[in-house]
From Swiss-Prot:
It comes from Helicobacter hepaticus (strain ATCC 51449 / 3B1). Disruption phenotype: Strains missing this gene do not produce hydrogenase or urease; addition of Ni(2+) to cell cultures compensates only poorly for this loss of function. Normal amounts of apo-urease are produced by the cells. This is Hydrogenase/urease maturation factor HypB. Belongs to the SIMIBI class G3E GTPase family. HypB/HupM subfamily. GO terms for molecular function: GTP binding; GTPase activity; nickel cation binding; zinc ion binding. Involved in the maturation of [NiFe] hydrogenases. Required for nickel insertion into the metal center of the hydrogenase. Exhibits a low intrinsic GTPase activity, which is essential for nickel insertion. Zn(2+) binds at residues 106, 142. InterPro entries: CobW/HypB/UreG_nucleotide-bd, Hyd_mat_HypB, P-loop_NTPase. It holds the Pfam family cobW. Residues 48-211 are annotated as: G-domain. NCBIfam families: hypB. Ni(2+) binds at residues 106-107, 142. The keyword Metal-binding applies.
Amino acid sequence: MNLSRNERLENNPNLNKKSIQIVSKILSQNDLKAQELREKYKQLGVYVINLMSSPGSGKTTLLESLSAFKDFTFCVLEGDLQTNRDAQRLEAKGVSAYQITTGEACHLEASMIETALCELQKQCDMQQMDYLFIENVGNLVCPASYDVGASLNIVLLSTPEGDDKILKYPTMFMCADAVIVSKADMMQYFGFSLTRVKEDLGQLKANVPLFLTSNKERESIAKVRDFIEQKRAQNYQSHHQF
């Protein structure tokens, strides 16, 4: 299942040759901008994490929980079609956040991040931050095709969504440097099979770290924090090619 971008485009029955050329050009331009962003992140000294998932899986809640660790400093770029509600939630926790509203776009692109980054820098001194989280638009499809220059890609899967999503949306989970099963305390109420998730993830992409989180269990959030800190200390850079 580990297909290159060109192979994925060529295997798409909804795209003709001309459409493939257009999409390929758009994605290539995004790649160039994403590489420029990587250099910008280095200059700012921030380690960048791209959070992806379905809507309502708990991305913002995870960030709220991480904000409780006072030695874990970060700011956030929030992606949604409309409203600044998620940015407001984080600001209420003392986190500097800038909301990107995409209109009808189902993902964030590198050019959007570039513009928003300038705005975020007006709100906070990013050189005093250890991390920048990019909370992508809630969608298990489109964000998997657009590089935003992040060093670490984390995908959330919430228990109410069901345990069958990994092989249904393989392109998304192929992006993952780690997978978080969120709302894990509700697993029993939804008949969610952790065994199935592990098997499907192992079939798709072996050795991907898997975390179970619950907003009620601080230790589960601490494990995610520790993982991110470890990756930053290693200067880990995702090997995934969008």
